[in-house]
């Protein structure tokens, strides 16, 4: 029987230059009869059959490598079969001249299918003497498919000494790809640029261009990124390239060595075991800061409702239940000094504590951070500002100023910035929460400037003007935090001043709002501390002052402070 199969093999091999299709039929006839005919499986590979089953059968029968070809004295090199071993790094193939080459093709295929353990088992069972660089490359391919980027770097870091200069160049691509996925964009750019000039540059051009584009975009070199993306769209079009061209905010989703090491299953990127102690701490801090706020009863209730809805949505999703997807973006309306920025920090801690955003980051901004002086530049400036807040909360105070009123004319610069913000709120909704703040009527005017803006915000929280009693309590907290205290007379003077302002209007608004509410209380305490220090400094026995006298703000200190602050605010009696 070996003679008959050998004869068929000889015929199939001889037909390759003339009719690859006929050769494939003959090789298939052999494998249909004998599934362990390794050489015939390799012949099928030579004819373009690199199906997973074919690669498995060739690998499974690798111990019979060269048996049929040897029976008819045809070297296996005559077939010129090659197996793909590039993985995500490039269109790289390797000649099938040994059982090791078969193993390489099989393992690369299994890794692409997510069968990492089988791939590594096949590699580890291979004799590697003299072929250590091939095994290192193959492991880098498997680790890359599993997004184990630190292991990729470990396998290829010695590639400069590999005897195969082509694979050494490809290893540079693997190193650059791993660095990019770890967020090390400067290193990624260096490695990929060097690899582009290596013997493997052409075979790996697609991966090099993609990851270089992502690295340069993250470094702020958008023109260079777009040039590479346009080349890819022309030569290797695919959905992610189109998406990256349409959306300048498109970025790689990066990871860290710590996250990779924290996987419960080393082959599963989604199995990261999170240490929840930091999250619990953030939630505790958020609640403590919320409880510490004076007044704000309605605000506290709304924040608790927001927290509960967000938390329960995550619980329902974890159990496979349907979850509504309301926007996380928020509107804070109310006068200045009513705690909007403080509550925004509380929200950042809550969202980070619940795992909605990656860090408790609050980026405070205003119009100047979004709007440029020249047409076409506001989009760029706004994008850079938004990028700073990715993974956290973007807080825009006095947001109504983004688009200014100009005697009935549009504000093109502000509108350009607003359009950019609107797009990013949607495109980056999984890694960005936006809070806009300002007077209620002014925020409503802003929302009217763009039809899609109002629908982006599912939560609106109203902040009320503080009452005189609440301002007194705020002042006492501020004083205590500064190792000061208000005497009964000082408290009485401050409360009386606040009550008088509560009954007045200034420039068409409640006087307490013009004074700044909580900021007004802080200004009074700080001015009173200066008055106290001046009074004590005039004494002749400074060294003998006890703690109580150093802390106490008396009635005259506060009365003088009120006069000073009111004069500064242009508030007349």
Swiss-Prot record:
Keywords: ATP-binding, Cytoplasm, Nucleotide-binding. The keyword Nucleotide-binding applies. Part of the ESX-1 / type VII secretion system (T7SS), which is composed of cytosolic and membrane components. Belongs to the CbxX/CfxQ family. One of its GO terms (cellular component) is cytoplasm. It is found in: Cytoplasm. It comes from the Bacteria. ATP binds at residues 334-341. It comes from Mycobacterium leprae (strain TN). This is ESX-1 secretion system protein EccA1. GO terms for molecular function: ATP binding; ATP hydrolysis activity. NCBIfam families: T7SS_EccA. InterPro entries: AAA+_ATPase (IPR003593), AAA_lid_6 (IPR041627), ATPase_AAA_core (IPR003959), CbxX/CfxQ (IPR000641), CbxX/CfxQ_RuBisCO_ESX (IPR050773), P-loop_NTPase (IPR027417), T7SS_EccA (IPR023835), T7SS_EccA1-like_N (IPR049078). Its main location: cytoplasm. Part of the ESX-1 / type VII specialized secretion system (T7SS), which exports several proteins including EsxA and EsxB. EccA1 exhibits ATPase activity and may provide energy for the export of ESX-1 substrates.
